[in-house]
Amino acid sequence: TCYENDNNVLPLLKQNLEYCKEKSGKKIDINIIEDNYILSQYLDFNHMIGGNDDPKKYDFVIGNPPYMKISKDAPEATAMPKVCYGAPNLYFIFASMGLFNLCENGEMVYIIPRSWTSGAYFKRFREYFLTVGKLEHIHLFVSRNKVFDKESVLQETIIIKVRKTSEKPETVTITSSKSNSDFGELTSLTVPYDLVVAGSDYYVYLVTDENEVEVLKKLHKFDKTLPAIGVKMKTGLTVDFRNRDILRDEAEEGAIPLFYSQHIKQGKVEFPIQKEHEYVVTEQKGLMQDNKNYLFVKRFTAK
């Protein structure tokens, strides 16, 4: 069974499916549903009046959903309030419906962005997705632009294998490759499930080596969050490329230091380092930090 409602794609899809059927030499029943994948099933998903109390379920679901932000008032978003909050994206709405389409203990493989693994906008989705299903395998791509190298897709993309079950597995397998053309050169890691999926927010931690696993084990031992101990984490107020007119390469009267990640070296702040745009000159309060004690965190790390 395939869902497709794009008239530009349907002829090629039908041709390819018939070709595969012929080449297989086996009896295959092909069913193409030319309908909106979400809106045609939302009554069933939400157990609403008019829905099918016993919809057809599948052993396997494979999907490469559209990556598109939609309005919170879009029909697909309002049809899936259980998983939508804030600024929804079609990809996780499709993934939710894909999991719904599975029979108990069925398996699902989706290629999707990794943005759902954290953040408030995806919390409802994670709660549903990781309660009804359980992650078994996650594949990471190191490159942002080599997975769909013929398309303008710069999302960090992952492939997930999920089983529809309430039984939590002991481990998750995490593999990684540079692109979609070197699957023969995978790095593989087996990680405890409770280390990867953790907390009341169901965050998914995508560790890639044993060092990251050890760091994560230590972090999970913390019993308080930063706000709980009176500490706030925030990004700097000044975005350089949006405020080019106030940037200065050298100190002058009224200049204020502008710190970049390059200024943090071996646990210390080194300033100046003779890089461009190390200073700003402005009277705009919204671009200046108060003169207080700060802990600088170098959050950007190399792949």
Question: Residue locations for each model-derived region?
Answer:
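Signature of N6-adenine DNA methyltransferases within the class I
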Residues: 3-14, 35-225
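Generic marker of residues within folded, mature protein domains
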Residues: 22, 150-152, 248-249, 287
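Conserved SAM-binding strand-loop segment of SAM-dependent methyltransferases
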Residues: 24-37
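Residues that flank catalytic or metal-binding motifs in active/ligand-binding sites
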Residues: 33, 155-158, 255, 293
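Polybasic, glycine- and aromatic-enriched phosphate-binding surface used to engage nucleic acids
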Residues: 213-303
